[in-house]
Amino acid sequence: MTATVLAYGYDGKELKTLKTVCARLDIRLRRVTAEEYAQPVGVFFGLTPRVESGESADEAIPERMIVLGGLTSRQLDAFLSAMKTARAGASLKAVLTEHNERWSGPALYVELSKERAAMDGR
């Protein structure tokens, strides 16, 4: 699998910064548009077939979110460090797994939000 970062909710300056970071590290960047949110995240990595119906494409993801797939440990460390240095981090980050590759963007967002709330003790 090609090292890829999926970007949800990125535009403007943040998207430009993310593009720069990914280009420097030879990581493919794929911006996911709101119209594509209902697709399983695995679709964008070539692992899961597209869906015809399902969740509404207008379900919002109110924060920036990234999904990382196919990165080596070194690439992952370099990416996270570069994003921190550039102050362009996403509120929510996930690594693609066999468990979440079939989830839509909004479903992944809900799960990551729950995990963050549990870790924050909310």
Q: Which sequence ranges carry the predicted segments?
A:
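Short, intrinsically disordered low-complexity segments
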Residues: 37-67
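Mid-chain, well-packed structural core segment of small domains
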Residues: 55-86
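Short beta-alpha junction loops
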Residues: 11, 35-37, 72, 98-102
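N-terminal, charge-rich interaction modules
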Residues: 1-47
